[in-house]
């Protein structure tokens, strides 16, 4: 009897077709002058002042978990920015949630707003994780 790991995995995840995007990226990487509009990863080194600020935060012992909503000081700054730039007022204590990236924000939004079986319009072309995210949240991509 052989061990079959997929027996123990979520069947919904196993049913989602695998994306061919990585193969595409490999081909595009061989093309001189191609501009990648892929995963949104910068093509430059993080600026020194940002790296230095991260190092200083570590040296200062700022290594504990934050609120699930994100750092209050960051949320307050986001609220100030939105007010100054767009004349929109948000309560940083109740209306702003910081995520580690757009994918996490979209995933959380889908899980909060969708009910099982809801249909969700997916624009084309779109990021490869949008449709699977809808499926994982119990919805139907349309």
Task: Label every model-predicted segment.
Residues 5, 12-101, 108:
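N-terminal small-domain helix-loop-helix segment of the aminotransferase-like
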Residues 112-142:
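PLP-dependent aminotransferase-like
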Residues 7, 61, 115-117:
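Short, surface-exposed connector motifs at secondary-structure boundaries
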């Amino acid at each position: 009897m052989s061990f079959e790991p997929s027996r123990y995995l979520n069947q919904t995840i196993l049913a989602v077709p695998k994306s061919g995007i990585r193969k595409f990226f490999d081909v595009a990487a061989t093309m001189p002058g191609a501009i990648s509009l892929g995963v949104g990863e910068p093509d430059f080194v993080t600026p020194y002042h940002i790296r230095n600020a991260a190092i200083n935060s570590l040296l200062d012992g700022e290594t504990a978990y934050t609120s699930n909503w994100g750092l209050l000081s960051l949320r307050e700054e986001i609220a100030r920015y939105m007010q100054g730039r767009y004349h929109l007022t948000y309560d940083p204590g109740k209306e702003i949630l910081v995520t580690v990236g757009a994918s996490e924000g979209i995933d959380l939004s889908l899980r909060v707003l969708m009910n099982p079986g809801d249909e969700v319009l997916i624009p084309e072309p779109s990021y490869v994780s949008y449709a699977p995210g809808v499926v994982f949240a119990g919805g139907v991509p349309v």
